Regions:
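Extracytoplasmic
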Residues: 2-72, 90, 117
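Generic signal for short, ordered secondary-structure residues
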Residues: 19, 75-76, 84
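Aromatic/His-enriched, Gly/Pro-containing loop or helix-boundary segments
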Residues: 27, 79-94
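Juxtamembrane helix-loop transition sites at the ends of transmembrane segments
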Residues: 29-32, 87, 139-142
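Flexible, solvent-exposed extracytoplasmic
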Residues: 41, 72-77, 91-221
């Protein structure tokens, strides 16, 4: 009986799974091979993101294997980020790519070679802006990014203002308006420590400033 069961299992299984479907453990542990572009980017030990424009950004798992990527694949999409991709990233909006701290682009050249290009205009991990534009809806918010000057401006949906708790700032003003901050040219804000669940920053400024962080806050993630 055992022999019959074994024969039945093997004969049926081989109809659906061939020997070619089995992979050596070393290939499973390292499913992707780093390109020369990947190796060049990995020499930079700072904290940044990479945009691989040689493939579908939101269906690509290989780039995330080597770098912090602005893309990647997951069956459960983050709605807001997917909208940001559809409305802005897919259109190569450079200001949005700068805002996402995209320091390197992986692109192809005329010869079909894959190359790494450094983006000199990336905003970094965090920065101060001197203007906050308040809009009335999520639609206005995503469309405002069409013309946003991300190094000096930020956009906030009016419904999100109450999340800013500090008094005497935009949190205490219940009208839809824009807010200006007197930029301190000597002010700094920098990322000191990067852990999976905790990011530590340090800032120094003589005046009240509005900081923008190049991160997605996902409470349960």
């Amino acid at each position: 009986l055992a022999v019959l069961i074994l024969f039945d299992l093997v004969s049926v299984d081989k109809k659906y799974v061939s020997e070619d479907d089995f992979k050596p453990s070393r290939k499973v542990e390292k499913p992707f091979i780093a390109s020369e572009a990947d190796k060049l980017i990995q020499k930079d030990k700072s904290h940044y993101r990479v945009g691989n424009f040689t493939t579908d950004l939101m269906q690509d798992g290989s780039t995330s294997f080597f770098h912090q990527s602005i893309g990647g694949y997951h069956a459960a999409k983050m709605g807001r980020y997917q909208e940001l991709f559809d409305f802005q990233i897919a259109k190569n909006n450079l200001e949005v790519l700068n805002m996402l701290n995209t320091k390197y682009f992986i692109v192809g050249n005329d010869k079909g070679e894959i190359q790494a290009q450094q983006n000199p205009d990336t905003n970094g991990n965090a920065w101060f802006v001197n203007r906050v534009n308040v809009v009335k809806s999520a639609n206005e918010e995503i469309l405002a990014l069409d013309s946003l000057q991300s190094k000096s401006e930020a956009v906030i949906n009016f419904s999100e203002i109450d999340k800013f708790k500090k008094p005497n700032t935009i949190a205490s003003k219940k009208i839809v308006s824009n807010y200006l901050f007197d930029r301190d040219s000597t002010s700094i804000i920098e990322l000191l420590k990067y852990d999976v669940t905790k990011l530590t920053y340090q800032s120094k400024t003589e005046k009240e400033q509005f900081a923008v962080f190049s991160e997605i806050y996902y409470k349960n993630g």
